[in-house]
Amino acid sequence: GDVSVVGFDDSPLIAFTSPPLSTVRQPVQAMATAAVGALLEEIEGNPVQRTEFVFQPELVVRGSTAQPPGRVSQVLS
């Protein structure tokens, strides 16, 4: 049977795969901004409470995945 493959992190090396790999892309810029902000607060001597950040990943569909034949696709939001 057919197999769909999904990666994680959207590495720049994915551009060299065949077929192009579908992936889950993390919001690296937002994650880095939050981490650096907390670090700078600590360095400045401000008390930093433990905080849980939730970041929204993005599914990037490329050539390594396909809709199963004969099924209706379901979009998750």
From Swiss-Prot:
Keywords: DNA-binding, Transcription, Transcription regulation. One of its GO terms (molecular function) is DNA-binding transcription factor activity. The keyword Transcription applies. InterPro entries: LacI/GalR-like_sensor (IPR046335), Peripla_BP_I (IPR028082). It holds the Pfam family Peripla_BP_3. Putative sugar-binding regulatory protein for the alpha-amylase gene. This is Uncharacterized HTH-type transcriptional regulator in aml 5'region.
